[in-house]
A protein has these predicted regions:
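Histidine/acidic-residue-rich, glycine-tolerant segments that coordinate divalent metal ions
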Residues: 1-76, 81-87, 170, 195
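Metal-dependent peptidase/peptidase-like ectodomains
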Residues: 11-32, 37, 41-44, 102-155
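Solvent-exposed residues in well-ordered beta-strands and their adjoining turns
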Residues: 29-31, 77-78, 97-99, 131, ...
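Divalent metal-coordination and catalytic microenvironments
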Residues: 34, 48, 94, 147, ...
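His/Asp/Glu-rich mid-to-C-terminal helical/loop segments that flank catalytic regions of hydrolases
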Residues: 47, 57, 61, 109-113, ...
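Active-site-adjacent substrate-binding region
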Residues: 53-60, 129, 135-188
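A conserved active-site cap/scaffold subdomain adjacent to cofactor or substrate pockets
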Residues: 83-108
Length: 229
């Protein structure tokens, strides 16, 4: 159920529907020194800032976004304990989202290369580790085509919408890897609400209208009955 889709509507997509999610950590190591004498050390804070900017150019300048969307987000920066000490080490944590396995592999390689070379240019080092969390949530095209009439019976033709791919991720992707599957969205947003003003998932003000689950129940029942015919 989706907080930014109106009650009574169903959204689906054939093929890659939700992104693969990977977490990364970059450990930037420099040389600690006093903040008044930066030339005596190697500043991992400045190097980390340069790496963050460099990672964004992987998406904006090195990735063919007309094929598929991709995201690199640095969301955590840890380093330093005092205002007048340049620390020895800074850690960057973030997430990578991709809708294509080839693009995923290339972006992983470029993150490692970008971080290490930027660090090297300043005399620092950057060690990158990437943890693959979920796969691309892939809807089997043949199954999806077969099940669209089931959605129409549940919600009406005007309320069944072919959606764009989503850069959020789902562990349902592991089921879809094993058997032909379909993952879809049912509306949980009150009618008349502007989707841009509806609070997204994973935020403090997230809210859904549970009456939207009626459409979901109808859809699931139709899917089961129609699939077994």
């Amino acid at each position: 159920i989706n907080s930014q889709t109106e009650i009574g509507k169903i959204k689906y997509r054939s093929g890659g529907t939700m992104a693969a999610s990977d977490w990364f950590k970059i450990k930037v190591k420099g040389k600690q020194t006093h903040g008044s004498q930066p030339w005596e050390g190697i500043d991992p804070v400045v190097v980390s800032a340069q790496i963050i900017n460099g990672l964004q150019s992987i998406i904006s300048r090195q990735t063919e976004l007309t094929k598929n969307a991709a995201v690199i987000t640095v969301s955590v920066i840890n380093g330093g304990v005092r205002s007048n000490i340049i620390p020895e080490e800074v850690s960057l944590l973030g997430t990578i989202r991709t809708l294509d396995t080839g693009m995923q592999r290339t972006i992983h390689e470029k993150i490692k290369l970008t971080a290490s070379k930027i660090a090297e240019a300043s005399g620092a080092t950057a060690e990158t580790s990437i943890d693959k969390k979920t796969l691309v949530t892939y809807n089997n095209p043949e199954l999806t085509k077969k099940m669209i009439p089931s959605f129409v019976k549940a919600a009406g033709a005007d309320n069944v919408i072919e959606a764009e791919a989503v850069t959020g991720a789902e562990d349902f992707s592991f089921f879809a890897e094993k058997v032909p599957s379909i993952f879809f969205f049912i509306g949980g947003m009150e009618k008349g609400t502007d989707p841009k003003k509806a609070f997204p998932h994973h935020t403090p003000d997230f809210r859904i209208d549970e009456s939207g689950m009626k459409t979901g129940i109808k859809a699931f029942c139709n899917l089961v009955f129609d699939y077994t015919k």
